[in-house]
């Protein structure tokens, strides 16, 4: 997605470099504040020189991506299991529970964090277009709006929860009616 933004538009990408300059004892806090400002500005690229901040940010994004993908994948597994084995909610329910858990955790921890709209940029063609000549081993974040993926993520989880709840309710009613007639 980030690649398309640079190639399809003629505008020069906006970027900010967080330099690794330790001029005080609270340099790391200053780096974090600078990163927060850059994230809020929704720049096309953020170049992070300080290795500790770059690693922490990269891991935070990775965990958010993992939660998002796990929620979608387990939601789809739950939907498919609910459709294939209509009378066995025991198969779909654990996948649905994991999907709902991951969606909830993502919503609480990542949804309102501006960092969730960035991805670690590894595409060489995109990186070549950035002026990175005087930067040493940076982590580069590329802006990638994710509102559509968040809606997909939530929709899959909620649909799987609704289908799973209906399946459990239907199985419960069958059990009650079969126990009452016997």
Swiss-Prot record:
InterPro entries: TMEM11. It comes from the Eukaryota. It is found in: Mitochondrion inner membrane. The modification Phosphoserine is found at residue 25. GO terms for cellular component: mitochondrial inner membrane. GO terms for biological process: inner mitochondrial membrane organization; mitochondrion organization. The chain crosses the membrane at residues 70-89, 91-108. It is a multi-pass membrane protein. Keywords: Membrane, Mitochondrion, Mitochondrion inner membrane, Phosphoprotein, Transmembrane, Transmembrane helix. Belongs to the TMEM11 family. Plays a role in mitochondrial morphogenesis. This is Transmembrane protein 11 homolog, mitochondrial.
């Amino acid at each position: 997605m980030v690649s398309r933004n640079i190639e399809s538009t003629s505008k020069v990408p906006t970027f900010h470099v967080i330099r690794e300059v330790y001029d005080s004892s609270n340099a790391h806090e200053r780096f974090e504040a600078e990163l927060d400002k850059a994230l809020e500005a929704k720049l096309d690229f953020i170049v992070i020189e300080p290795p500790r901040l770059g690693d922490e940010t990269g891991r935070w994004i990775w965990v958010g991506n993992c939660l998002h993908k796990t929620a979608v994948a387990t939601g789809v597994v739950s939907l498919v299991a609910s459709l294939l084995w209509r009378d066995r909610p025991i198969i779909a329910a654990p996948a649905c529970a994991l999907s709902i858990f991951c969606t909830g955790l993502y919503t609480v921890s990542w949804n309102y964090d501006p960092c969730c709209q960035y991805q670690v940029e590894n595409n060489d063609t995109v990186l070549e277009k950035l002026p990175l000549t005087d930067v040493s081993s940076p982590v580069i974040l590329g802006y990638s709006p994710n509102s559509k993926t968040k809606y997909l993520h939530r929709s899959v989880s909620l649909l799987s929860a609704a289908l799973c709840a209906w399946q459990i309710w239907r199985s419960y009613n069958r059990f009650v009616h079969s126990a009452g007639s016997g």
